[in-house]
Amino acid sequence: MPSRTARYARYSPRQRRRRMLADRSVRFPNDVLFLDHIRQGDLEQVGRFIRTRKVSLATIHPSGLAALHEAVLSGNLECVKLLVKYGADIHQRDEAGWTPLHIACSDGYPDIARYLISLGADRDATNDDGDLPSDLIDPDYKELVELFKGTTMD
């Protein structure tokens, strides 16, 4: 096999350098890029990935989370709404049995929790450790405490 330099010998030095750099560029899988767009809150790119069917919303990624879980974890309500609009399952569990509502409660996102509940998220779903979403609420998260008032909290 010819060396890299020999392969690009017919090009000018500038073109050769450009082509050699292009060969070295890193390409990430679509799901990695998709999750990065979710974490950054880039709604335009998230929507584009879904519309072009480059990703599945049901996939549990190597992080152990699905796309909706990642959006909740980032605290971006608009991204959560977009994923739900395109069919993300609000009842989907991650590798530890957490639903998006568990994450919203644990991380202190009352607007997201309220939105998920308005769509019918199960307040009584338990994760693999037997915790309800309300069990994970820090008492300092007053809005969440109020939202779940009347349900058992430790």
UniProtKB/Swiss-Prot annotation:
The gene is PPP1R27. It comes from Homo sapiens (Human). ANK repeats lie at residues 63-92, 96-125. Keywords: ANK repeat, Protein phosphatase inhibitor, Repeat. PANTHER family: PROTEIN PHOSPHATASE 1 REGULATORY SUBUNIT 27. It comes from the Eukaryota. GO terms for molecular function: phosphatase binding; protein phosphatase inhibitor activity. Inhibits phosphatase activity of protein phosphatase 1 (PP1) complexes. Pfam families: Ank_2 (PF12796). Disulfide bonds: none annotated. SMART domains: ANK. This is Protein phosphatase 1 regulatory subunit 27. Interacts with DYSF and PPP1CA.
